[in-house]
Design a protein with these regions (language model features):
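Active-site-proximal loop/helix segment associated with metal-binding centers of metalloenzymes
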Residues: 125-132, 137, 148, 159-173, ...
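Glycine-rich phosphate-binding loop signature in dinucleotide/nucleotide-binding domains
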Residues: 23-29, 92, 150, 180-182, ...
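Active-site neighborhood of divalent metal-dependent phosphoester bond hydrolases
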Residues: 55-150, 154-157, 163-182
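N-terminal active-site segment of His-dependent metallophosphoesterases
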Residues: 1-88
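Beta-strand-turn-beta hairpins that frame and shape the catalytic cleft
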Residues: 1-4, 149-155, 239-245
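Active-site neighborhood of phospho(di)ester-bond hydrolases with catalytic His/Asp-centered motifs
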Residues: 6-7, 33-38, 42, 73, ...
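Acidic, His/Gly-rich catalytic cores of divalent-metal-dependent hydrolytic chemistry
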Residues: 202-307
Length: 307
């Protein structure tokens, strides 16, 4: 089966539309689109992103095509581009499965970790909470925090599988252990930085620092933890060995690895091949929406810089 896994859309409808179009054009037919949390937060289009995701999950009975067409009607898109994006969304109808992240939980009124959010994030999540429709509040509130796919040998979680509500940042291989990973492959997000780590029963090793280096090293692990000097964008997962993998799929709506392009992962559970993808989109439009919503300017600038 072929899966696309993405995370951290963060209310950025411009990035989401570009990624959906790319998936339809580049990945051919996929079996499932998986979203690893944080559909909202930071960006200025939380309802639009929720409406699209609800359509992808439940189909047109829960989110009509008319409302989707209105969302697609962006001034920088021509009629042909709009038509292609609508076709792409329809092609993924009822193929999506989504879990929640900390911003989703907080914005929907679920107890979370607002006190631990920085002031900019808290300002954005409070604004998001105030503009979300009742339907989207309910939708976010009922999202699971973890989802396992036994046939594929993997699971998705926003941060860590052992304590999904804790929203710990997996910034390097030392943040996890073999015993705290419950599946052969775990796909997560939260840091907004793509990465891939291999864990063995004896040691922790970094298989590949995908696209960017890990944030930092624990010097005590340096003898067993090595980082690839290559910017690997694809590799095969070895199901024959007793290894476990943690794959950070990066961010669609607010990358923080110095590359402003949206990021997602394509995974084929039959061939065991995994690809990281980057998708350019209209960052100026997304940044302008944030400014017009009077959200913190730092968020508008971060969209442009990817950092």
């Amino acid at each position: 089966m072929k899966y696309v896994i993405l995370s951290d859309i963060h209310g950025n409808v411009d990035a989401l539309l570009a990624v959906i179009k790319e998936i339809a054009e580049k990945e051919n037919i996929i079996d499932n689109l998986l979203i690893a949390g944080d559909i909202v937060g930071y960006g200025a289009s939380p309802n639009e992103c929720c409406d699209i995701v609800r359509f992808l999950i439940y189909g047109r009975k829960k989110a009509g095509l008319e409302s989707i067409s209105k969302i697609i009607d962006q001034p920088y898109l021509d009629s042909k581009q709009k038509e292609n994006i609508l076709k792409a969304i329809i092609s993924l109808e009822k193929k999506c499965i989504a879990i929640g992240g900390n911003h989703d939980m907080e914005a929907s009124g679920e107890p979370s970790l607002t006190s631990e959010m920085n002031p900019i994030a808290k300002t954005a999540v409070d604004w998001t909470k105030g503009v979300l429709t009742k339907e989207n509040l309910k939708f976010l509130r009922h999202l699971s925090l973890r989802m396992k796919f036994s046939k594929g040998g993997f699971e998705i979680v926003h941060s860590t599988p052992s304590y999904p509500r804790g929203y710990d940042y997996v910034k390097n291989a030392g943040a996890l252990k073999y015993t705290t990973l419950w599946s052969k492959v775990t796909f997560g997000g939260h840091t907004h930085r793509p990465a891939a780590y291999i864990y063995t029963k004896e040691t922790r090793t970094v298989n590949a620092s995908v696209l960017i280096p890990a944030d930092n090293y624990d010097m005590r692990l340096m003898l067993i933890e090595k980082e690839s000097t290559n910017k690997v964008e694809s590799f095969d997962i070895d199901f024959g060995k007793e290894w476990k993998y943690y794959i950070n799929v990066g961010s669609v709506g607010q990358p923080r690895d110095g590359n402003p392009h949206a990021c997602y992962v394509a995974f084929d559970s039959t061939s065991k091949h995994l690809d990281f993808r980057r998708v350019p989109y209209n960052t100026e439009a997304a940044s302008k929406k944030i400014q017009e919503a009077a959200l913190p300017n730092e968020l508008a600038q971060r969209i442009l810089k990817g950092a």
